Amino acid sequence: MTSTKEIKQLQKAKSKAQSSNNLKEEASLCNQLGEVYAKTGDYQAAIEEHRQELALSEILHDVIGSAVANRKIGECYAELGNIEAALKHQRLHLNLARSVHDAAEEQRALATIGRTYLFLFDSDQSANSLKHAEDAFKRSLAIVDERLEGTVSPREISEMKARLLLNLGCVYDGMKEPQRCSDLIRQSIYIAEKNNLLEDLYRANFNLGSIHFRNGQHSRAMRCFEQSKECARKMKDKFSESECFHSIGKILLHLGDFSAARRSLKKAFCLGSQQPSDREAVKKDFRHAIRGCQLEQTAAEVTQKFSHEALDLSEQLGDLYCKVGCYSKALEAYQTQLACAEALAKPARELAVIHVSLAATYTDLRQHHRAVEHYRQELQLRKGNPKEECETWLNMAVCQEEMCQSMETLDHCFTSALNCAEKSGLNKLQRRVLRVWLQAQRRCGSSQCDDTEARLMELCERDGLSLDQSEDEDEEDEVDNSEPLEDSDIQYSESDDEDLEGYDKMVTGRRKTQRWNRRNEKGETVLHRACIEGNLKQVQYLIEQGHPVNVRDYCGWTPLHESCNYGHQEIVAFLLDRGANVNDPGGRECGGITPLHDTLSCGHFSVARLLVLRGASVTVRNSKGHTPLDTLRQWFKTYSGQLDPETKQECLETEKLIKRALSGDVSVVCAAPRQQKELQDSQLFDAEYSEPLLRESPPSPPPITRPAATVPTSKDSAPKHRSTSASTRRPRGMEVDVLYGDDSSSSDNPDSDCSLSPLRPVRSRPRSPPAQSPQEVPSSQELPSVYGIKETTVPPQSESGRLEYQKAMQNLGSAKSRLFSQSLSDPAFTSTPAVSANSRAALVPEDQYLADDWLEDDLIDMQPKKKRRVSEHNATRETTSRSQNNSSTIAEVPPRVQSCSSRGSLSLKKGSNKPRQVKMNQLPGMVMLGRREVSRSQSPIMTQESDHIQEPAPPSHQAMPPASFQNRAAHVPAPIRMRVKVQDNVFLIPVPHSEADSCTVAWLCDQAAQRYYQMCGLLPRLSLQKEGALLLPTDPLLAVLHTNEEVLAEVCSWDLPPLPERYRKACESLGVEENRRVSRVCEVQDSSSCVSVCGLSLSPASLNPLLRALKLQASLTELRISANRLNDELLPEMMAAAATMPRLRVLDISANQITGEGLRKASDAFETRSQAAFPCLEELNLSMNPLGDGWTQALASLLSSCPLLSSLSLQACGLSARFLQQHRLLLANAMASTGNMRSVCLSHNALGSTGFELVLKTLPMHCLTHLELSAVCRGPSDQPSMEILTKLLAQGDCPLTHLNLSGNGLTDHSVLLLARCLPVCPSLVSLDLSANPLVTSTGLHSLLNGLVEARRPLGHLNLQGCQVSGPLAEDCLDSLSDHIRDLRLCSQSLNKLDQDALQQSWKRRTEAVHIFSRNSKCMLSISSPSH
């Protein structure tokens, strides 16, 4: 229910209570009304309601009611900033609660008073306010602890405690006591979590996150905000969730991650904010994030390191980084700007500005000495400009003061500043210097204050000002130079819709971007199609509904390009009014053609004049170097022989207007004023849905060139008029029209439906014979006035009849022959060198534009005869891309179903279908490969006149005998299949016969990628190679490959969306339900270097999609999946996923029910690899898995795949001596081959004495530093043999530092053998002999004697669980403290006197001593205590 509706209902109920004289009900309704008003921010109205509640409660003698009313009034006053009035009413609340001995209400009163003092601290920053707040909160907490037990519910008590602890934490935050603050807030979080108090948990996490953010602890802040966001989501509180997204976005902005910040801030904006100020703050940060993404993307596309473009981008990025507080990246940007400026030899004035930016940024980073360096460099560059020098000296003085420099140093800076100010002659500047100087002197307690103040007073009196009179500074606050952001301009992406799940009924005004992102095969949106078809109403509707104006198709054309190309003047004007880029050069395939170039190339002069008057550049050049004037002259030169006087006059007027614009005599007409917006819709339209200016690889058919203007067939065929308005509007296509390219509706029917068909293929105008060889067009300075001269076209006399005949035949032939002949002809006129044969023009002449009639029908004898003949009407119809031909053309080329566009004679005069240019991507049937053109087959065309599919009728001279015809028709073609090898997988991909001719290499890449994704869970971007040669994506498949031929696919990159999205897709692909805990882990640990799902007991079905999602997580260094149910079947999948993580250092799969069989399966997958599967893995934990014996070879194979492995843990894996009786040497070689193994843990495996001996023979003792062999004996009679161990330790080069032999039934004799090794094994610093009850004081004496002989201390000795008893000799006690730094004993065998003697001997040490003695433990340490 909305607040307005709730208020109306409460007011209605209040009126009813008043009419019935129900005072108690009326007071209750006043209370509710006041709360609603306060929630909406109308605190004055809330105060009035609570005043009425107070009056009614006093009449009713309701003390608690009066107390509550006073509390509410006080809270409203506090929100309004009237602290005095707030405290007055809150103290009344406290007194009333005490008068009736209501402990709960007294507690609330004290908490409210404390909160009010916190409000006061925000404004006055007074320690006294904090002290009052602390006192109130502590007294309130004491009441909760002492007086409320049993009187209120436990949940309420927990709620009160959580809130009071949070408030106290905020108090100590203000007192600058971070540890107490953190402890209290964490206590609040714990209580809230334990009792499921979502609102309090949200508030505590949010406050703690804000504190971490303020202290620069970004990762902790992010974690807190994520937790508070989850609470808000559970509470279905969209405003609170929006606040969390906003805070996360601000952190990401502060880190300079604009892309991630934009995603978070977009979610915040979509969810909305309760207060207008909060919404404006979100919009401001959102704008910064969008701008940052755009600048970073543009900067990534800059190819030249030192260029003007790089210079401008660096400055903009630096300024933006400063705005969002990311000063470290701002420094990098400004330093790049400085390097560019110096390389480009920029003047000193510009270099000085950059030094100012660097100095200010260093000041923000508190690196004042670096700031002073840049100010000094600025000073050198400002020579001769006293005003700027003065500003620099003042800035230097501020930095020097921050550096705590002496007053003499500051006086030097201020004196220099004052001298510069006097040179400038600006009294205002002199007064400013003196004011700042005086303030600095007062802060430092200088004795010169009086002199400076006298000089300032003298200067003020001279100008008629008082000393205390403030002056406006010259500097103005920085104003954001963007327009106000309108909510309707925001474009939501699909991911945002998913993030808003659960709020579909709560969030108003949400729009789906899918409706604007639907494109046809050419990448055209619905707006493109509306502009092409001239449907002004549809264009207006789409723009009003929020369709982006500057969206591009796959080639790069915008809707403005299309409307200019088709000459729709009203649409052009409307698009310009709505922010269309009038100078957009198009995409990479568009040849730098602006809308003005485009419309001039088509002869739409009225549109061209409109563009010029609306600010279109007349100096910009396309990729051929042509200006708009060059384009106009080229068009005139091409068609001058067919123009009527009226058209020539229009051409002349357009030329004059362009020349006036070149001289600056044209005043630009601005668009009609509209409500300004902060962000253009194209800015907020996601880049993943709106095609970028430069596209690496279009996702659909490759860009194809636009047809250029048509050449009239002959001068005699020109009609009397030429129209500049659209004449080819078409009705909306039905589904069959879209699929089969039906274009049979009349374009001349004025009553036809003009609504939009977003997937209709475009039609070109009728084609004419090719133009004559163009002559060189005069330059801009020497254009003759030929527009009024009537010219005639005379064919060249030197051309023989044979050449004329060949040209005619080429024009009538197939697309292949026409284009091939054209590629051999002379290049068209250009003011720049001719383009190579392999290059493609963005505009293609319409006589080469084939539209839907691109198929060369050379399989006519394979087509069966139709039972019904094609109608006479259809047989005589022309395609949209063919010109009028004589009867020989119809006899040679089979007729097709074509458009019923007008067959009137071609013309360039008004009232006719004028020639126009068609886009590259509107050639649906061919791909240009240098000079070779491959024609593709096309789906049959359906007409509205007949329900039957019309096929071309075979010509009479190729008719086949009926029997032969039937045999061919009955023949079933062999299947077409391609074999694609992607890494270690080979896919057999069938090619449908119906699409075989149209399939390209890109299609095959896509099919292979989808199959690889289904198998491995990764979506690659592939390129194909055949015998070492790279296949282009645009290559026709059957032209480069044969059926059953195998090609090698190389992975160019991987499609890796954020981890939560990958997990969601993996669940969909595997058909399993998402696990909420795993989804939460993915969200929290997406950008983390560690992913941990330990202890979740996840089933294989829940783990499988997670493992798929984690593949190729390049930043991952730690993967911990312990205590789950991975099992043998899923282990190979997990290992395969881990092998795709190039930086993985730690892999923990302990306690996952893995057996030796699973390990064998996993190792088999890596045997065939030529490179190590885990090149960076350092730690592998397989503990607590029932591996058993018999998999030594598999372990050796796995270790061979980890060349950097240094730590291996096989604790409690059910191993015995048989584990090493086979393939032991193989395992030993795998461990020793790399020389990196440092730590091995085989504890809690029943190895016995035999296994113990085999382990020591297998392990690489020459490099091992940590060895854990605790509890490996099988019984009291099977003790491990110490002789081999002592022999290894006695070798001089043994690097072992930590040895654990606990729980192995060792005796004093075993310890004696170890003690003899101590003098010859100096590296051993830690020895764990705990849980060996047969070790007594004798063993301890042996160790001490060995240490005395070694003349070195032992860092750690653990004898807990051993029978070390007293009495201990005096020399033994002294030796203990001298030679053991950390000793751990079992005190059960030591009496009180022995323990005291031991502690006293330890305390005689001069170093810091830590002693812990409790129950059966006695721990003595010289260094810091071990935890």
Swiss-Prot record:
ANK repeats lie at residues 522-551, 555-584, 591-620. GO terms for molecular function: histone binding; histone reader activity. GO terms for biological process: double-strand break repair via homologous recombination; replication fork processing. The keyword Hydrolase does not apply. Its main location: nucleus. Keywords: ANK repeat, Chromatin regulator, Chromosome, Cytoplasm, DNA damage, DNA repair, Leucine-rich repeat, Nucleus, Repeat, TPR repeat. Belongs to the Tonsoku family. This is Tonsoku-like protein.
